[in-house]
Amino acid sequence: MDAHIANETKHLLVHGNSKTRALVHIIVPDACLKKAGVDPVKLSDRHRASPSAAPVFRVFAQTRYHATGECSLWRTVFAGYVPSGAIVSALVPTVPADHPRLFQSTPDSGGLFVSLEIECDADGRFDAFTLVALRVDIADDPRTTEVLFTYDELLPPGTRYGADSKRVALLCRQFVAYVNSHPTVSQSAVTAASHIEAAVAEDVKSASGPQVSYGARIDPAEYLFSGGGFDNHQALARLEDDDKEIMSLIRRASEVIAKRNPVRVLSNPEVNGDAHRRQCVASGLRQGARGAHASDSHARVGFNSSIHDATALLLGLEPPDSGRFVNSGPQRHLPPQGPRSPASRDCQSGMLDDVLLLTPENSNPLTPLDWLDVGHAAVAGGDTPRDVWRRRPISLVARKHYGTCETFVVVSYENSTAWGGRRARDEHLAGSINPPVMQACVAAGVDHPRNLPPETRGELIAKFPMLTVPLGDTPPPVAAFDAAAELALIDHFRGACVSALLKAISERLRAEPRMSQLIEYDIPNNNRDCIISVAQRAPELLEAVALAIQNVTVTEFCNSALMLSALSHLNILSGNKRGRLPYHRSWLPSLAGGADAFLFDYYSSGGEVVKVSPVPLAILVTATRTGQHSCRFARGAPDSSSKTYERYLPGECYAYICVGLNRSFEALVVLPGGFACRASAARKLAWPAHLVEPILERYCWTIPSH
């Protein structure tokens, strides 16, 4: 939950109350992370062999606009991973170590807390097909993984605060039960528990509160999948009216008190030659608020500003420990006040830290939740923003993730300004622009918005300018009104790169079937039989490798030498003033190697030929005086913790066939023993010019031109 609060704070600092920017808080459970390719175990410090100051993982987000191919820059977002009981951690306030059974709950799985930015028009309307890409970079995992969320997935039809009423009541009951069974807790907690118990008993008597039994546990699945549907707008309106009525009663009561005991205006004699006219400080303000003084009074020689400030403040106040706002009563329910000023407690400046109360000292908070605030802070030894949010109504909405078919959770808090929060401005994310488009399709009898008549499309574009590209006359760069458009784009890129590589290798072998020992190795006589076996199996091995490359999945492709080299090649061709570098960590060693730096994917040569390297290995291939080439690791010699394939250079081990590419998209296929062939895949890469920028923006860092 701290990640949600941090992201919301950052969002408000950057965008303020912008009408075109919003935020949505989500929890991504372990099941969804696993299906997306993120290993939840590696998101926790527990799997590390030794502690490290470096973060376990970092999360980046990018907005990808509907059908345009355009993207925002990658931006870092705060994220937090809870290994166990992720949803429970949002529903249950902090349980102190010395009070481990304060609140009882049923733990759920782990989950990732993160917040995603939503862009909309000035009326709060958003495009449901715009999506947010979430990238998780794990320190101990060189692979990169993206999780895609469309706005339609992220923004439910409504909130479910009503389903949370039972949890709030159960928190109160559990607190009362714990305090009543533990006499050692502070008196403030006992007082709070007694008031909560009285209020809950009154609710039960009037049957106005949710019916919960003592001993029940807070179960996140119960609130997530049962307890009612979306909040009824009429019911929410009634709640708001009730709140307004309560505040009206409080205001009227304060006016009555003020009429009975009007605030005095005092004119006191001159002090140090200056006339002072002071009003009483409003009740509830700290007495330490500075009074207005004569501007020259501080400059006087021998002037004691501390005593003078106290005198000036207290002149207009009622005497301490007496007056119409204070009477004798039990111990104050507020938390203990902070340390006094350095001055003596007996002098007037020591009174500056006192707090004036609007009502008598034994006056109660308005609701059981107010008392829960006081009691929980007393038991926990203090309060935190996250506990304030936990002790108030929370909306949990289960959503189905399109890419993984798993559930994730959209969270809204009463004290939040993000989507669904009760502190959000009016007309905050008012709705999607797509229902009017669908209605137009039904009226026109077409099955796709781009098949609408030109005049209808023009009307929709005039009403919603963000539909200019999806509904324009020119076919959009990326498929419009298709939730799978992003997957189709990267699969298209995968197909183009695979085709270019295989065509280049095939053309090279047809022109020159013989493969010489391009990589220099000394082969002992006792390995002669292995070399003969490899030579005899070479056609079958190459065919099997080609088949493995052709069947590579999108996830494997995004972590392959093939994709990273293709991105570098496209960046050179684009001629863009803003340089781009593939954000994959495996590409970093290639920055200093130039054309000699190759990224190699390793494939097994025994039995079934499969890709064994989850990420490519950076190898420097340099020419020697003999006309052959030598290889060395770009990152230095591997250590004992390296995987088996990482300990061998291309061609050095008979168990692997290696396929490498450099930044010029030149391929090098190396068989055991160093027998290899080179081919230019760049000449065979056919990628549309209008899709160069979209693919680079998605998978590269952008380097500013200045």
UniProtKB/Swiss-Prot annotation:
Residues 321-347 are annotated as: Disordered. Its main location: virion. GO terms for biological process: chromosome organization. It comes from the Viruses. Keywords: Capsid protein, Host nucleus, Late protein, Viral genome packaging, Viral release from host cell, Virion. InterPro entries: UL17-like. Interacts (via C-terminus) with capsid vertex component 2/CVC2. HAMAP family: HSV_CVC1. Capsid vertex-specific component that plays a role during viral DNA encapsidation, assuring correct genome cleavage and presumably stabilizing capsids that contain full-length viral genomes. Belongs to the herpesviridae CVC1 protein family. This is Capsid vertex component 1. It comes from Equine herpesvirus 1 (strain Ab4p). The gene is CVC1.
